[in-house]
Amino acid sequence: MVSLVLADTADSSDLSKAAITVEESTSAQQPKFFNYHEFVITKYRALDEESCEEHGPENPICITHFPNIYVPEESDEFRTTRVVRIPRRFESSTEFPNFSTQLPGSEPAALPDTHNKEFVPAGEFEGQWYGETSVSPLSNYLDQAEWTEIVTRINSLLEAAYNPITRRNFVNVILDLLTLNLWSIIEPYLFVNPLQSVEDYVSEINRSESFRLKGIKIIPPRESSYLSVCIDSPAWIKPCTAINEPLLTHCDTLIVLL
């Protein structure tokens, strides 16, 4: 990052007389990446409380999982699943979608964690449990190595699919010219879209024994317009009024890549 500093001059309106110095920012001043999907709230029901109370900015909880918008709102799956959203990394590439390989809570600017990267409920908000840190329920199902392997593969498939310099694209351009753009209408019905490789890989992961046993799945990125990766996971449900029930209610899990 570069900052410009204007020194005092006799005539401040005359910028040509202003002395401009360039100061290189230190690494500590550089922007740090965080999961921009998450946010904090201060009014919630803590574990030892019977009603929702205001806790102030010193004791917030972090919203790290969200309603499953990929199923009908009136369905059982909507009630029993939640979505963990994984953000894009625009500093890595703007030419094609590139998603974060870091589990929520592991990002440089994540809210600090003292529970060894495990999701630990601290408060209830709108019938769902949330923790005090950026760690999401996803960390209770996948470790960093597993997640990195999955997202790295997705990113590499997306890079290959969005690469404009390929033999297929070259042939398509020639045929479009020869057929007055009719080829671009016919071609999708004759050949598989390169992005289908991403969908096939996601389907393969969702069918894996590990994902089936854990009750989690990746939402195909196409459903989120490649804006994020979403994970479908079990809901962490506990109504405000049910303070004597078990801490967690286990349901099907949703993992989404956004």
Swiss-Prot record:
Keywords: Endoplasmic reticulum, Membrane. One of its GO terms (cellular component) is endoplasmic reticulum membrane. Its main location: endoplasmic reticulum. It comes from the Eukaryota. It is a peripheral membrane protein. One of its GO terms (biological process) is protein targeting to membrane. It is found in: Endoplasmic reticulum membrane. The keyword Endoplasmic reticulum applies. The ERF2-ERF4 complex is a palmitoyltransferase specific for Ras proteins. Palmitoylates RAS2, which is required for its proper plasma membrane localization. Belongs to the ERF4 family. Interacts with ERF2. This is Ras modification protein ERF4. It comes from Kluyveromyces lactis (strain ATCC 8585 / CBS 2359 / DSM 70799 / NBRC 1267 / NRRL Y-1140 / WM37).
